[in-house]
């Protein structure tokens, strides 16, 4: 139990040390205080979603896709799930050594309702180790197409909420770059990504725009905001999607128009389904 200022009551000091949020002697330095601020700010967005699912009375399942070292899952368990007599967190990761380390840490901490699965995207959608429906899907700093993988997983699992912090959206930028000369003759909008730095930044932005449209086309209300304390990073965009049932009528059409206008037709399968 923690009595350290700045740390929420009841948090596991051992966990925070394992996650390098606390130093080995249980102290907060400037860097770890920044990390803690980031974690708590992200939790501020996720906690109401957890409460929403819990209030429905049908249990609570959360899958962290591309979990890495599963620090988000551990923090959520420590702050929310630990005090409950129900709920389960699944960490999905393709690197077996990280899955094993997370499993060992959960056992050591007594976090009994956490599972760590060494599965690919396609495997995770159909694996019997996961329930047919997952309430909340998270993907933190999921690189390149990993955010899209998490969205596909969330849609397949009929998730009530998705919480996404995308990272390194390089694929769309590479397609913009490949067709740059052709685009110059097609649309004046190509000026938006003419310099290489603009290609990278515009590619990242349009990737997330297309992701939001995809979610809206599947009946989700989407909000996009900035994470406080992550300003030093380009990876500070937070996408939260909550299922409402009514699809935005023109979302699919908008996606198709954007892909065509920007010479990204080859990415249709990734963003329109």
Predicted features and spans:
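Secondary-structure boundary elements
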Residues: 48-52, 82-86, 108-112, 156
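Conserved class I S-adenosyl-L-methionine
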Residues: 58-68
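Conserved SAM-binding loop of SAM-dependent methyltransferases across substrates and taxa
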Residues: 69-84
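Conserved SAM-binding motif I beta-strand of class I
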Residues: 88-93
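Phosphate-coordination loops involved in phosphoryl transfer and adenosine-cofactor binding
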Residues: 59, 86, 134
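Conserved alpha-helix/loop element of class I SAM-dependent methyltransferases that forms part
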Residues: 38-58
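Class I S-adenosyl-L-methionine
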Residues: 1-18, 24-25, 29-34, 40, ...
């Amino acid at each position: 139990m923690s009595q350290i200022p700045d740390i929420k009551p009841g948090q596991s000091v051992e966990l925070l040390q394992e996650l390098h949020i606390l130093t080995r002697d249980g102290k907060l330095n400037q860097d770890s205080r920044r990390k803690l601020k980031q974690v708590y700010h992200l939790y501020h967005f996720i906690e109401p979603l957890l409460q929403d699912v819990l209030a429905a009375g049908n249990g609570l399942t959360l899958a962290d896709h591309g979990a890495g070292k599963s620090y988000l899952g551990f923090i959520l368990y420590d702050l929310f799930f630990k005090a409950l007599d129900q709920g389960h967190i699944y960490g999905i990761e393709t690197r077996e050594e990280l899955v094993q380390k997370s499993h060992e840490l959960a056992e050591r901490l007594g976090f009994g309702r956490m599972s760590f699965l060494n599965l690919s995207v396609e495997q995770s959608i159909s694996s019997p180790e996961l329930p047919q429906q997952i309430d909340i899907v998270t993907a933190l700093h999921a690189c390149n197409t990993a955010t899209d993988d998490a969205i596909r997983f969330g849609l397949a699992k009929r998730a009530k909420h998705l919480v996404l912090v995308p990272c390194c959206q390089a694929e769309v930028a590479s397609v913009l770059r490949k067709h740059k000369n052709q685009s110059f003759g097609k649309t004046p909008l190509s000026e938006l990504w003419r310099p290489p730095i603009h290609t990278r930044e515009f590619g990242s932005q349009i990737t997330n725009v297309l992701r939001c449209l995809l979610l809206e086309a599947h009946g989700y209300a989407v909000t996009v905001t900035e994470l406080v304390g992550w300003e030093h990073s380009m990876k500070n965009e937070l996408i939260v999607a909550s299922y409402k049932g009514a699809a935005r009528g023109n979302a699919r059409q908008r996606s198709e128009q954007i892909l065509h206008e920007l010479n990204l037709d080859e990415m249709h399968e990734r963003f329109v389904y």
